């Protein structure tokens, strides 16, 4: 048999591994065309084994990064080489791909994006046919093929690439149609920070259709500037614009628009914890929140947890990552979950975080309440002072084995003993960046400041050196 020989993806590299949000890294270094092509082929071969209808299409979308065209095309080449029909929808939010895979009988989907990361990074997220991220067992099977460096077999039943940008409008319609007749945002002035990324594709259109007066920032696709000093990780431009425009609220999206943060009319941050609190209150009042339970993460603020418990609610903490939140939601039968960073999951709407849907729901909730977002924020909870610092650790093995660092473990124990139940420490390796994240939360700002600096110095001295 003729074979198409492919360079091993392991040549000169660490083994390829799925992280908390797919495969992510520097485009052209970790994420090469060869890797994307091989990944496409082996994703196809593995997914083929999971269905009795292997001719179902595979859907690919992308954000605005300069490397996204290259990676999307290479991934599509691998999938067509494996015999699949590929529908490339172009620029879209990640939740658009999740929605389309779940509603078009696709065998799977992929989003080319590195979410909130800088423009030079990129990533590939793989979705199963139900719109959820690929399960760990299938990820491991794909990893094994990639890291074996096998040649890609020649097939005679090639697939074809189809450009289907019109499918993005199906997603847009699904978000706006249930509310469009009611026009719930009529008269609402809102600022949208689209981060030069995927949110550009549909977000302003949906807000306009629901009656809002829209002021858009960073509102075209720009691969050089995606997430640069804008979006959900850099709120200053949004805060300033909301105050200057005297807007009721503002929303900032990340590069692939699967998460969102808000600011109120005073420019104060309304993060994922606040959104969960408001949404949880609403579902609780409608008797639609089983066991009054919300799934959050280890990053969620103690102030939120204690305020929710004071309402008679339960809060379960998952590991960081929306797939872990989703798993805990399924385990506990929860309707609502999310992350402080703005990934919000409500099982009324699907299985993944959706920045646009979350923003529309929050804006509608505020309008229906008769109060302003600022008033709702004031009535919610007082967050504990919380500090999050990232320490760059280039050595991957040191990052993954940070728990074996005895000086750091001793310092963590000392900090926790000092704060008792009035604070907490969280140290973890990022699943998306080469950093160790250090978070300290305490009732008093000076205590949080002290232990954060002490722990950052310890990580720097023993892991980053």
Swiss-Prot record:
This is Phosphoglucosamine mutase. Binds 1 Mg(2+) ion per subunit. Pfam families: PGM_PMM_I (PF02878), PGM_PMM_II (PF02879), PGM_PMM_III (PF02880), PGM_PMM_IV (PF00408). One of its GO terms (molecular function) is magnesium ion binding. The active site is at residue 115. GO terms for cellular component: cytosol. Keywords: Isomerase, Magnesium, Metal-binding, Phosphoprotein. It catalyses: alpha-D-glucosamine 1-phosphate = D-glucosamine 6-phosphate. Mg(2+) binds at residues 115, 254, 256, 258. The keyword Disulfide bond does not apply. Its EC number is 5.4.2.10. The modification Phosphoserine is found at residue 115. It is an enzyme of class 5 (isomerase). GO terms for biological process: carbohydrate metabolic process; peptidoglycan biosynthetic process; UDP-N-acetylglucosamine biosynthetic process. Belongs to the phosphohexose mutase family. InterPro entries: A-D-PHexomutase_a/b/a-I (IPR005844), A-D-PHexomutase_a/b/a-I/II/III (IPR016055), A-D-PHexomutase_a/b/a-II (IPR005845), A-D-PHexomutase_a/b/a-III (IPR005846), A-D-PHexomutase_C (IPR005843), A-D-PHexomutase_C_sf (IPR036900), Alpha-D-phosphohexomutase_SF (IPR005841), GlmM_bact (IPR006352). Its cofactor is Mg(2+). The keyword Metal-binding applies. The gene is glmM.
